[in-house]
Design a protein with these regions (language model features):
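Ligand-binding pockets and gating/stacking loops
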Residues: 1-344
């Protein structure tokens, strides 16, 4: 791969990922202001601060809004190993499709009652829906009814096989390993082949405020092999050039170890990794000081900048204003700046 200045940030636990260093652009000066998990995750997922009474969409929903759905037989966005944040202020069909465990695929796919009874209940529900639409002819009501009907068709189609990683060859399953995260990445690759536009795979358990050194090394080891396998697999199949891969977190960890042998929340400086999708790999963007506390080189990169950069790579109009619920104006990326060096 050749030497890349700054790749020393990778520890021995990520030696497999280091082999793909020429594909990676590492953002060293990510930063934000909140050190609370819920608020930090929300900000990193949406580029907006959490506000009572307002729900903001994630990037997959933004992409569907601007570019339309790629397929009526598959969801446009899938979240693996995470909850379901909903569509934000977009219609219901813009919500991501949640998969709790990739090994189990789509749970409760088949009705646990006789099929005739199930179909009869669906028909009754549709009758009630049509009556409701008649008396409340709102766009939101129609969108929900359409979303419900499309979901039923999806569950009854052969496209659901894309969610079954057991259909993969043993060699492919072995490549990704048996961890929940590895299986999630394998499912992500299958979904990319079926034209799903936006996929998120979650690896939790990084909250190492107690005995954080051991926990951090363990989690890093769990990340390394599956993520390296994912990048290599996408590259071999010709998918990496058209797929931007993003590895990030809600905030960093203090360089200083606390009295409990762990690291506390540190939103001021952390890193993100980008690959594929037009990214110019083999570079490190920005630099913190020798203690990892303050930015020493390059611009501070905000969650808004990261979102805007991804949106730009997707071809979304980052300068176009739209109006959400209540007529409030919004921009994808919340008016961040494109990190041009990522593509240079």
């Amino acid at each position: 791969m050749g030497h890349v200045d700054g790749m020393c940030m990778f520890k021995q636990k990520t030696w497999l990922l280091l082999r793909h260093g020429n594909k990676l652009a590492i953002l060293r000066t990510m930063g934000q202001k909140t050190g609370a998990h819920a608020q930090g995750k929300y900000l990193m997922h949406t580029a907006f601060a959490m506000r009572p009474g307002t729900s903001h969409p994630q990037l997959g929903s933004w992409a569907q809004y601007f570019l339309g759905r790629r397929s009526r037989s598959m969801p446009d966005s899938v979240l693996i190993g995470a909850g379901n944040p909903g569509p934000g202020f977009f219609p219901p069909d813009h919500a991501p499709f949640p998969i709790g465990d990739a090994s189990k695929g789509i749970r409760d796919l088949l009705p646990k009652i006789d099929r005739k009874v199930f179909n009869h209940r669906v028909q009754l529900a549709q009758r009630f829906s049509r009556v409701f639409e008649k008396y409340f002819p709102h766009d939101e009501v129609k969108a929900y009814a359409q979303f419900y009907d499309e979901t039923l068709k999806f569950f009854d189609s052969k496209t659901v096989d894309a969610f079954d990683i057991n259909k993969e060859a043993p060699k492919a399953r072995s490549l990704y390993g048996t961890s929940k995260f590895g299986r999630g990445l394998l499912l992500a690759r299958r979904l990319l082949e079926h034209k799903v536009r936006y996929i998120e795979v979650t690896l939790g358990g990084w909250d190492g405020m107690h005995n954080g050194m051991n926990a951090g090394e363990q989690r890093t080891g769990e990340l390394d092999a599956p993520f390296a396998a994912f990048l290599g697999d996408l590259d071999q199949r010709g998918l990496l050039k058209e797929t931007m891969v993003v590895l990030t977190t809600e905030f960093g960890r203090t360089p200083k170890i606390n009295q409990r042998g762990g690291r506390d929340h540190f939103p001021g400086a952390f890193s993100a990794v980008l690959a594929g999708g037009g990214v110019n790999g083999g570079q490190v963007i920005g630099q913190t000081d020798e203690k990892g506390i303050k930015r020493a080189k390059g611009d501070k990169i905000s969650p808004q900048d990261l979102h805007t950069t991804i949106a730009h790579a997707l071809g979304l109009p980052v300068d176009e204003r739209i109006h959400g619920s209540g007529g409030r104006p919004f921009f994808v990326g919340n008016q961040g700046s494109v990190i041009k060096q990522v593509f240079a």
